[in-house]
Design a protein with these regions (language model features):
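Soluble, non-transmembrane alpha-helical interaction regions
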Residues: 1-176
Length: 176
């Protein structure tokens, strides 16, 4: 939060017409996105969804590993967007549409959809490996949107949830 506010104070004396809202909006969007993604994974009642480590070490480890990897996936996707956004702006972008292409246009170099360096695919692979290694079978460990799924099907579902939340975070942060 402090870094965002400090950067905004230094760099955004006169905010641009597109691609930026405010430090407060950016911080709120990031925090809400993380809360929403956690609810997507564990459902609305986090208290009953979390598996305690004392009675069920394996279930607890499964949830912790997957949550950590899902958060890494969100970070990788957001980092790809930010890098693409910087390149597009440096290239003279004059509209929010050009920034939107950094999310879903695989023809835009560096976009999330492009994943030219394979960082997103690598993290999705790590997610699937973690599910197989730490959560076999996951059972009721993830009672949210992807409930009752396992293996790569669970991984694909979690990846879709991350993609959705990352897009919502970007839309809120950048007003696009």
């Amino acid at each position: 939060k402090n870094k965002t506010t400090t950067d905004a104070t230094k760099s955004c004396v006169t905010p641009p017409d597109f691609g930026y809202t405010s430090a407060a909006t950016i911080n709120a969007a990031a925090a809400q996105g993380e809360v929403d993604l956690t609810a997507d994974i564990f459902g609305p009642d986090l208290g009953s969804a979390v598996i305690g480590c004392n009675p069920n070490k394996a279930g607890c480890a499964c949830q912790q590993k997957i949550l950590k990897t899902v958060e890494q996936l969100a970070s990788v996707k957001l980092a790809a967007f930010v890098k693409c956004k910087k390149a597009v702006l440096a290239g003279g972008a004059t509209s929010a549409e050009r920034l939107r292409e950094c999310v879903s246009d695989d023809g835009t170099p560096g976009s999330i959809a492009d994943d030219a360096k394979g960082k997103i695919a690598k993290t999705v692979g790590a997610l699937n490996a973690a599910i197989t290694k730490s959560c076999n079978p996951p059972g009721s460990a993830f009672p949210g949107t992807c409930t009752s799924l396992s293996g790569s099907t669970l991984g694909a579902c979690l990846d879709r949830q991350v993609e959705c939340r990352v897009c919502q975070i970007i839309n809120e942060m950048d007003g696009i």
